[in-house]
UniProtKB/Swiss-Prot annotation:
PANTHER family (alphabetical): 1-DEOXY-D-XYLULOSE 5-PHOSPHATE REDUCTOISOMERASE, 1-DEOXY-D-XYLULOSE 5-PHOSPHATE REDUCTOISOMERASE, CHLOROPLASTIC
Pathway assigned to this chain's UniProt record: Isoprenoid biosynthesis; isopentenyl diphosphate biosynthesis via DXP pathway; isopentenyl diphosphate from 1-deoxy-D-xylulose 5-phosphate: step 1/6
Protein name, per record: 1-deoxy-D-xylulose 5-phosphate reductoisomerase
Key words of the record: Isoprene biosynthesis, Manganese, Metal-binding, NADP, Oxidoreductase
EC category: oxidoreductase
Family recorded in the similarity comment: Belongs to the DXR family.
Organism of this sequence: Synechococcus sp. (strain JA-2-3B'a(2-13))
Annotated NADPH binding sites: T10, G11, S12, I13, N38, N124, E126, G205
Gene that this polypeptide is encoded by: dxr
GO BP terms, alphabetized: isopentenyl diphosphate biosynthetic process, methylerythritol 4-phosphate pathway involved in terpenoid biosynthetic process
Cofactor(s) essential for the protein: Mg(2+); Mn(2+)
Enzyme Commission number, as recorded: 1.1.1.267
Gene Ontology MF annotations: 1-deoxy-D-xylulose-5-phosphate reductoisomerase activity; manganese ion binding; NADPH binding
Length: 392
């Protein structure tokens, strides 16, 4: 029986993780849950999974959560705010922490879990994108295991099992191409919010669906792969793979290529993140390659995906610039989801913010957090200015 804490239990990764806990009750026990603001769903999860500690990110919602849990015995310890999230992440009973919080908000709780000696099933790419310079040294210091849950990084992690150190030459991250893979670049100025939220293959949260449409999701994954697997950016490539069956590939020193294949369903990489180093039998339909018939790949169209280029540039520059890019992207996507900016304004805003940032080459945690906050403010201010001056 493995005791887990789930950060971001009411989001897409969180709810799918709990599906698996319910499917394998003899293997997994939930000891901690957190949500930023979805009090009603969090209360339902508490009633079903009976954790020992629960955190709500928005402190003002704690009384409502307490009220919804009236009659629960034993009542879990209830905490709130960033400090509460970190308390749950470091809960003494947990062996593995699943980080399903969206965005840079997952950084501090993940660091708390590492300092408490917990293995991390990492579903929050922003933790490494923004915090790689501080997270990886801490992982090594505390000797914890970092198991990637993103489907692409899980695929690479799986392909590397048993591969001798030093044999990895190149990583090939696959991308569906998002909602606009079949649109000409000239038509992207007509994109609506509804258009951008129509992902062709995956069922995901709203923010990551927009990131898939801009290919920023893949750009952030390039930076994450750099930190996880130690390759420089010249050896991490992106392939458009419309079927989303090959989740990523690795090329070895002798030119052999290994790949991990599966249906586009996050339950599989989440389950591997929970069970590693074991593999659990599942009742799911096996992959039918004969039925699929063919798999296709092509290079990404750089004109359509400027966010991808911004991510490569930020990763190569390093320091605080990836944190700035990530924070600006979170802020810009939030504005787009509120229909306050246009789709093509997202990369324009990101480029302006990155140009204005004074990069700190070897940042501390405080430097990263300050850069994150600055980028969010700068993005909001630029978006309020006249589009002709700022976003054209």
């Amino acid at each position: 029986m493995q005791a887990i804490t789930l950060l971001g239990s009411t989001g897409s990764i969180g709810t799918q993780t709990l599906d698996l806990v319910a499917q394998y009750p003899e293997r997994f026990q939930v000891v901690g849950l957190t949500s930023y603001s979805n009090v009603a769903l969090l209360a339902e999860q508490v009633r079903r999974f009976r954790p020992q500690m629960v955190a709500i990110g928005r402190e003002e919602l704690l009384p409502e959560l307490r009220s919804l849990l009236t009659g629960i015995r034993p009542l879990p310890e209830l905490v709130a705010g960033t400090e509460g999230l970190c308390q749950v992440a470091a809960h003494p009973a947990a062996q593995r922490v699943v980080t399903g919080i969206v965005g840079c908000a997952g950084l501090l709780p993940t660091l708390a879990a590492i300092r408490a000696g917990k293995d991390i099933a990492l579903a929050n790419k922003e933790t490494l994108v923004a915090g790689g310079p501080v997270v990886l040294p801490l992982v090594r210091e505390y000797g914890v295991n970092l198991i990637p849950v993103d489907s692409e990084h899980s695929a690479i992690f799986q392909c590397l099992q048993g591969v001798p150190a030093g044999s990895l030459r190149r990583i090939l991250l696959t991308a569906s191409g998002g909602a606009f893979r079949d649109w000409p670049a000239e038509k992207l100025d007509q994109v609506t919010l509804a258009d951008a939220l129509k992902h062709p293959n995956w069922v995901m949260g709203r923010k990551i669906t927009i990131d898939s449409a801009t290919l920023m999701n893949k750009g952030l994954e390039v930076i994450e792969a750099h930190w996880l697997f130690g390759l420089d950016y010249d050896h991490i490539d992106i392939l458009i793979h419309p079927q989303s069956i090959v989740h990523s590939l690795i090329e070895l020193a002798d030119t052999s290529v290994l790949a991990q294949l599966g249906w586009p369903d996050m339950h599989l990489p989440i389950l591997y993140g929970l069970s590693w180093p074991e593999r659990l039998a599942t009742p799911w339909d096996p992959l039918d390659l004969v039925k699929l018939g063919s798999l296709t790949f092509k290079a990404p169209d750089h004109r359509k995906y400027p966010c991808m280029e911004l991510a490569y540039a930020a990763g190569r520059r390093g320091g605080t610039l990836p944190a700035v890019l990530n924070a600006a992207n979170e802020a810009a996507v939030a504005l787009f989801l509120q229909e306050r900016i246009r789709f093509l304004d997202i990369p324009r805003l990101l480029e302006r913010v990155c140009e204005r940032h004074q990069v700190i080459a070897d940042p501390s945690l405080e430097d990263i957090l300050q850069a994150d906050a600055w980028a969010r403010r700068e993005t909001a201010q630029l978006a309020q200015q006249a589009p002709a001056q700022v976003l054209a």
